């Protein structure tokens, strides 16, 4: 039986232990796929440039042992990950409550 595909999304700028723990917990449900907010979405959402450019954030997230694959999200705004969902076709979408807003 194939493992379920699990999807999470975020900016992951200044990747830290809280992100790693989130990945670990999400990966308990199956193979973990991660969407990363683009530089443009980061600027739109946080009103400043990220500390690390999208390609560097992608590299760091892919290096995390719990992550099967990672992508730079091609959409914009809070739901910037929708085009990535069309690529991954996850069985499970995991959303955390950390750093959230009413829109989240």
Regions found by a protein language model. Give the residues of each.
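Nucleotidyltransferase catalytic core that binds NTPs
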Residues: 1-104
